[in-house]
Design a protein with these regions (language model features):
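Glycine-rich phosphate/diphosphate-binding loop of Rossmann-like nucleotide-binding domains
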Residues: 43-136
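Rossmann-like adenosine-cofactor binding region
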Residues: 110-179, 184-186
């Protein structure tokens, strides 16, 4: 494929196959390979969190983050947040917190532990106590108002399950959430991987980049965040059709 195409964008491939396919393509091809369900989602999530933290007056480096869903998107989000310098990061799957005492983890989740804080075991309810940020890439209804009440003041919730998020925005705001994002276009702050990948590919193609690195993803997230000059609770992420996105992101993929 490499002689015929300038780059490969992978779409709608579930874990763990997506990890294997992406890694093999990166190894065998000398063109950029990017699974946007993983990395595009992670880039836009980080961009939104950078601005959400500004809205509530917190530093991401001091925040406790709880991530539910350790599949393709969750894995990429965890890795990028850690590389950015997030404070404390716990991941939760269907069996509880991913921790040192778990003996049921597959190879991908075991590798993911390198990016997590794994000294605490228990349930989502245990993990979310004292958290500043909740990120959901799992399924509807997992986050309750009672859980939000256990979070720190001015909690940030990115409930990204589609089409129905882990908690609906109106219910989350009634429970005290300060900044809310979803994966849907009919609510403010849509986390859509289409915000990121066109500009990343434009930059890679224009600049002859053969591998899209973690540094490129971090640069893209920071560039996206910078397009929101004065973040508010209802605007921490640019709109997906913002004409500034592609040239701004492309300029940092060098």
């Amino acid at each position: 494929m490499a002689p015929s195409f300038g780059a490969i964008n992978l779409e709608d491939i579930a874990a763990p196959k997506c990890f294997e396919i992406e890694e093999r393509l990166k190894t065998e091809c000398d063109i950029p390979v990017f699974h946007d369900d993983q990395h595009g989602t992670a880039v836009v999530t980080l961009a939104g969190l950078i601005n959400a933290a500004k809205v509530v007056g917190k530093q991401l480096s001091s925040c406790k983050v709880v991530l539910i869903g350790a599949g393709a998107a969750g894995t990429a989000i965890a890795k990028l947040l850690r590389q950015y310098g997030i404070g404390t990061l716990y991941a939760v799957d269907s069996r509880g917190i991913i921790s040192n005492d778990r003996t049921d983890l597959n190879a991908e989740k075991t590798a993911l532990m390198d990016y997590l804080d794994t000294n605490v075991s228990g349930t989502l309810d245990d993990a979310i106590t004292g958290a500043d940020i909740f990120i959901g890439v799992s399924k509807p209804g997992l986050l309750t108002p009672e859980m939000i009440a256990k979070m720190n003041a001015d909690p940030i919730v990115f409930a990204l399950a589609n089409p129905t998020p882990e908690i609906m925005p109106d219910l989350a705001k009634q429970a005290g959430v300060a900044v809310m994002a979803t994966g849907r276009s009919d609510f403010p702050n849509q986390v859509n991987n289409a915000i990121a990948f066109p500009g990343i590919f434009r930059g890679a193609l224009d600049n002859g980049i053969k591998k899209i690195t973690d540094e490129h993803k971090l640069a893209a997230a920071i560039a996206i965040a910078g397009l929101v000059a004065e973040p508010t609770a209802d605007e921490v992420i640019p709109a997906v059709f913002d004409e500034r996105l592609v040239p701004t992101i492309a300029a940092v993929i060098v």
